[in-house]
């Protein structure tokens, strides 16, 4: 009887330290662990991802894409801690994009401003209005809710690069987690997008562009990020974008979550499948050049952002929606060689913000 009681007590202890009571079951390992051990394994796994993939070099300036949400807030906190603990030697900055969404982004930016003080990281905010002459509120007013995520996604990606160029950083890190990457793999399969499928699982992208982007959370589950933020009592903004409930990605997200309930490792399995995909030798990949209008990296005469802006400014918001076909149907135009893309981004003008 006594042995049975001891076994019962042991089963209620953390499976790693056998000292404290567990507070959660890890989604990808199903281990029941205590809070202290969770902090340790969570941070150590991210450190190992950084080291094994050689994401940074000592002395580099690194911008953290900060939205105020759970992912970027936890990323900023953990990267700051690891930078000090393991002496990465990085100069870290927060980079936020103001899309101009009243009642959403203005509130989340207040969270980022608090994070700036809490973590002691300099903050740079770049707005769509300054870059493109439009806010997302104005764009949605013109085009409606359909396709608004296309505009925002294109503009946001370029805005992050332009903000990073202003900060003169060598790397840009984002809080994309394992769930996000699994969703992207699934979406690219459903769309038949071979080009994007070939690179969406890469932990570092854009190495041929102005500023490489890294994803330290590539193998980190969203659930664990939420739990880490909760236990650490981190200050983050949890409201969903008011324009995104009907986004196509949302359906993929729900499907992934259903799979995870049945098989917890489904997320990592999907990422592994994406990594194992190989591009057929007959598939011709578009050659990267630079946009004639703004100098941003592009495989067409004009980059996607400039095509979308041209449509907005001409009252033709559907221009540029869908697969890239070049400007005015001229998709076979010869593109400029990349050369010094970073220099082009800083020296060309986009909207009213001069780079």
UniProtKB/Swiss-Prot annotation:
Pfam families: ATP_bind_3, zn-ribbon_14. It is found in: Cytoplasm. GO terms for biological process: protein urmylation; tRNA thio-modification; tRNA wobble uridine modification. Belongs to the TtcA family. CTU1/NCS6/ATPBD3 subfamily. GO terms for cellular component: cytoplasm. Keywords: Cytoplasm, RNA-binding, Transferase, tRNA processing, tRNA-binding. SUPFAM superfamilies: Adenine nucleotide alpha hydrolases-like. Residues 328-337 have a biased composition (Basic and acidic residues). Gene3D superfamilies: HUPs. Plays a central role in 2-thiolation of mcm(5)S(2)U at tRNA wobble positions of tRNA(Lys), tRNA(Glu) and tRNA(Gln). Directly binds tRNAs and probably acts by catalyzing adenylation of tRNAs, an intermediate required for 2-thiolation. It is unclear whether it acts as a sulfurtransferase that transfers sulfur from thiocarboxylated URM1 onto the uridine of tRNAs at wobble position. Pathway: tRNA modification; 5-methoxycarbonylmethyl-2-thiouridine-tRNA biosynthesis. This is Cytoplasmic tRNA 2-thiolation protein 1. It comes from Arabidopsis thaliana (Mouse-ear cress). InterPro entries: CTU1-like_ATP-bd, CTU1_C, Ncs6/Tuc1/Ctu1, Rossmann-like_a/b/a_fold, TilS/TtcA_N, tRNA_thiolation_TtcA_Ctu1. GO terms for molecular function: nucleotidyltransferase activity; tRNA binding. Its main location: cytoplasm. It is an enzyme of class 2 (transferase). It comes from the Eukaryota. Its EC number is 2.7.7.-. Residues 320-341 are annotated as: Disordered. PANTHER family: ATPASES OF THE PP SUPERFAMILY-RELATED (PTHR11807), CYTOPLASMIC TRNA 2-THIOLATION PROTEIN 1 (PTHR11807:SF12).
């Amino acid at each position: 009887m006594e042995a049975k009681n001891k076994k019962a007590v042991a089963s209620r202890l953390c499976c790693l330290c056998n000292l404290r009571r567990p507070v959660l079951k890890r989604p990808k390992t199903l281990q029941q662990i205590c809070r202290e051990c969770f902090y340790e394994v969570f941070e150590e796994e991210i450190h190992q991802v950084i080291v094994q993939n050689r994401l940074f070099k000592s002395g580099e300036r690194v911008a953290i894409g900060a939205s105020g949400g759970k992912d970027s807030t936890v990323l900023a906190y953990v990267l700051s801690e690891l930078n000090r603990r393991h002496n990465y030697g990085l100069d870290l900055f927060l980079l936020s994009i103001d899309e101009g969404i009243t009642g959403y982004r203005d509130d989340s930016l207040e969270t980022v401003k608090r994070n700036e003080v809490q973590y002691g990281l300099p903050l740079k905010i770049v707005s769509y209005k300054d870059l493109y002459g439009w806010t997302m509120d104005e764009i949605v007013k013109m085009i409606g809710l359909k396709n608004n995520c296309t505009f925002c996604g294109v503009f946001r990606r370029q805005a992050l690069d332009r903000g990073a160029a202003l900060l003169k950083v060598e790397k840009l890190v984002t809080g994309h987690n394992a769930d996000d990457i699994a969703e992207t793999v699934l979406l690219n399969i459903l769309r038949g997008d071979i080009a994007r499928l070939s690179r969406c699982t890469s932990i570092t992208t854009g190495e041929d562009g102005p500023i490489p982007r890294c994803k330290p959370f590539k193998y980190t589950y969203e659930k664990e990020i939420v739990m880490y933020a909760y236990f650490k009592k981190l200050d983050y903004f949890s409201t969903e974008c008011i324009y995104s409930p009907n986004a196509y990605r949302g359906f993929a997200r729900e499907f992934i979550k259903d799979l995870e309930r049945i098989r917890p490792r489904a997320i990592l399995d999907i990422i592994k499948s994406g990594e194992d995909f190989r591009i057929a030798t007959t598939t011709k990949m578009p050659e990267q050049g630079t946009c004639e209008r703004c100098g941003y990296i592009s495989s067409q005469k004009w980059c996607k952002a400039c095509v979308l802006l041209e449509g907005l400014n001409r009252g033709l918001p559907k221009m540029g929606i869908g697969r890239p076909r070049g400007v005015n149907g001229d998709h076979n135009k010869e593109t400029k060689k990349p050369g010094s893309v970073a220099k082009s981004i800083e020296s060309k003008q986009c909207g009213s913000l001069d780079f």
